[in-house]
Structures are given as structure tokens and as C-alpha cells.
Amino acid sequence: VSVLTEPDAFAGDLAHVAEVSAALPGMAVMRKDFLVGTYQVLEARAAGASGVLLIAAMLNDAQLQDMLRYAHRLGLFALVEIFAADDLERSVSAIRAAGPAIVDGRCRSLLGVNCRDLRSLKVDFGRFADLAPRLPADIPRVAESGVESASQAARVAGLGYGLALVGT
């Protein structure tokens, strides 16, 4: 379950993570926000999250690696989100530097492709197909944004995405 915590644009709140975690014990709950530092990762853990979203375009290489490793140290998974091919190589490098993406059958790191341009907010569903051949097979793939129907979910699954974020 992805829980928006960004208050200004999305009316989110960190308390929502705690509420959802309490209501759905055993369910993976991810903090979805514009995280820029390890303290926000710690906040997510303290609120009961089991994972965090890390947007590669918002982070330099050192921040991305630090936040990814810190999330893992806290026992959290990290969904590293890319929008453009520019962020693919450095995101994969950061994920690999943090250790195996899957340990004991549990995802520690996932690689997400967001087909919504964060600047214009326009959705380009074709981005999933464009980037799919370049995504490594050993890191779980997530299709983010633009998936609004079962047929679209089937399309991204056919491209090799094992997971999808549906909704805002």
C-alpha cells in the first residue's frame, strides 16, 4: 500500500502511514513523498512504514546511495523511481551497491518507472515500453502512474513489470 505523506500538493500526512499500518497488519506500507534526507527515512520507519519511495531525479548519487543503504539498515525496502533513461544507470548502480535486491524472498530494492512527467504531470504510457528492455532482470520492476485498468496492468506485466502502483 502506497501512502502519500506530502502535505502541500497532495494533502498527505505522515500520520496516515501509522493509521494504514495499524489497520493492515502484515501488509507492506510505503511512504510516498519527496524524500531528500535520511531523517525522512527514519520518520517513515517510526511511523510504521515498511518501505520508502526514493525519486532518483531529486537526489544526487551520494544522497541516493545513502538513503538506500539507510533504508535497508532500518529493515525497509526502497522503491527507486526513475522517469527518464538518464537516471537508469545511476539508480541501478546505487541499488547494486546497496546489496542484493531480493534477500530471503523479500524485496529490499525495487526499480520503478514513472510514466508521469513530474514537471508537466502528463502521462506517457509508452515510457514503460521504451525503458523495459533496458531494465535489469534481477531487480523487481514497478510500473508507476498511468495504470488505470486491468488491461493496462496486463500490458505492463507483458513488458516485464511484476508490480504496478495504481492511483495517485
Could you describe each region identified by the protein language model?
Residues 5, 31-33, 56, 80-84, ...:
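A cross-domain feature marking catalytic cores of carbohydrate-active enzymes
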Residues 3, 43-63, 102-107, 112-118, ...:
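Glycine-rich phosphate-binding active-site loops on the catalytic face of alpha/beta enzymes
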Residues 104-166:
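Catalytic-face loop-and-helix region of soluble metabolic enzyme cores
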Residues 20-32, 73-83, 134-144:
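Short beta-strand/loop segments at the ligand-binding rim of alpha/beta enzyme cores
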Residues 6-25, 33-42, 54-72, 86-91, ...:
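Active-site-adjacent beta->alpha loops and helix N-cap segments on the catalytic face
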Residues 92-99, 104, 119-120:
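Conserved alpha/beta-domain cores
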Residues 36-48, 84-98, 143, 147-166:
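Catalytic cores of alpha/beta
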Residues 72-77, 93-97:
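Short helix-capping and hinge/turn segments at secondary-structure transitions, especially at repeat
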